[in-house]
A protein has these predicted regions:
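Short, structured beta-strand/loop micro-motifs enriched in basic residues and often containing a Trp
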Residues: 46-56, 100-108, 213-221
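Conserved mixed alpha/beta catalytic, RNA-binding, or beta-rich assembly cores of soluble enzyme
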Residues: 182-188, 195, 199-306, 317
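Intrinsically disordered, low-complexity linker/loop segments enriched in Gly/Pro
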Residues: 128-231
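A generic structural signal for residues embedded in beta-strands
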Residues: 73, 121-124, 238
Length: 375
């Protein structure tokens, strides 16, 4: 299944991108306005609520919510928050080896969304992101990890630097003379996946004997997407594989370039990432896709970067030829993707490489910019 549009007779909802509830993602931390009738929950990053490197579909949900409710989720940084000032590269390597096969990510969850069934789509609105004040970036020693990081062999000893974040200016100093604006987004956002699904097992060691799935690789369930467009005000669409969806998030980033070439971003933690999951019964989704105030974004992930590009373009063409804003043929969709589509390398360091293709909403002139129709 791919992103598609329900038949007009079944349409129950129109998502208008130009609604006032959408604000420009970026320096600000506010996004959509949640529905007035929704309930609000808080999920703290306690030891009971955080797992290290694995999605386990057998985990008891830490929250059970209804579609449209909002949740403020706290996150902690890699390796259960153990990477902090004073820890040197030897200590980071030791932590990496302690969780062999699993990802380095600390993930908070899972959250069960009542009514979500396999075949549905979860629309996840990112309402607000409030970072904590500490961050780091590192690349592992290329002599020990020659394939981890794009230029790993050229940096045999590895490198780590810790940063203090100015959360008023939303900036950090890289070094004297270089200041970086913060653009927080969740590097990892996932729904649960059936461990018996053959594609989920591709590329060991993505799963283990317990039926858990590593957080390391991105896939159809989202996971380690590292898509830097998922800032406050954006919306992520994920296919549902398991009853209740089962939502996790972690790998919190405060800034990342496309490619994430040295292995890590400006890795941080969130005091709060507020989300609003909504179950869409008639919106069918294959690969994750997203939207911001300005663009629709379609993703592809594969060990082969060319194949990741192909998947992203296929999703783009299918969506364009299915949308109801300005109907078009597949041939026209393919042409439009080539003329205005902006396909970017999401990341090249998560074994499964990523490409995302962005279609600007502004080209649909004089039209109400409807993201999709379905319920």
């Amino acid at each position: 299944m791919r992103p598609s549009v329900a038949a007009p007779a079944t349409l129950a909802l129109v998502l208008a991108v130009a609604l006032a509830g959408h604000t420009q993602p970026g320096k600000g931390s506010e996004g959509h306005a949640p529905a007035a009738a929704s309930k609000h929950y808080v999920l703290p990053a306690t030891p009971e609520n955080v797992q290290w490197g694995w999605y386990d579909p057998g985990e008891k949900p830490r929250l059970v919510i209804n579609s449209g409710d909002t949740v403020s989720i706290e996150t902690i940084s890699h390796s259960l928050g153990q990477i902090k000032p004073g820890l040197d590269m030897d200590g980071i390597v030791k932590l990496r080896k302690e969780n062999d096969g699993g990802g380095p990510h600390s993930i908070t969850g899972p959250i069960y969304v009542s009514g979500a069934e396999p075949g549905d789509t979860l629309e996840v609105r990112i309402l607000k992101i409030v970072p904590k004040p500490d961050a780091f970036n590192f690349n592992l020693p290329g002599k020990d990890f020659p394939t981890v990081g794009l230029l790993a062999p050229e940096f045999p000893e590895g490198f780590v630097r810790y940063y203090k974040l100015d959360l008023v200016k939303m900036q950090t100093q890289f070094k004297p003379g270089i200041v970086i604006d913060l653009q927080p987004f969740p590097g990892t956002f996932a729904v649960g996946v059936d461990p018996n699904e053959p594609d989920a097992k591709a590329g060991p060691p993505i799963h283990d004997a317990k039926g858990r799935t590593s957080t390391l690789r991105p896939w159809k369930n989202g996971s380690n997407m590292d898509l830097n467009e998922l800032q406050a005000g954006s919306t992520l669409y994920l296919p549902v594989f398991l009853k209740g969806g089962l939502i996790w998030t972690g790998d919190s980033h405060c800034r990342q370039g496309n490619g994430e070439v040295n292995l890590t971003a400006l890795e941080c933690a969130y005091k709060e990432i507020e989300i609003q999951p909504i179950v869409r019964k008639h919106l069918k989704t294959d690969w994750p896709w997203a939207e911001t105030k300005t663009d629709w974004i379609f993703m592809g992930y594969d060990e082969d970067l060319n194949q990741a590009m192909k998947i992203a373009v296929e999703q783009t063409v299918h969506w364009l030829s299915s949308q109801q804003i300005v109907p078009m043929s597949r041939e026209e969709a393919y042409a439009l993707a080539s003329i205005v589509g902006d396909c970017r390398v999401t990341q090249v360091v998560d074994i499964r490489k990523g490409v995302h293709c962005m279609i600007p909403k502004r080209v649909f002139v004089g039209q109400r910019q409807v993201a999709h129709q379905g319920s």
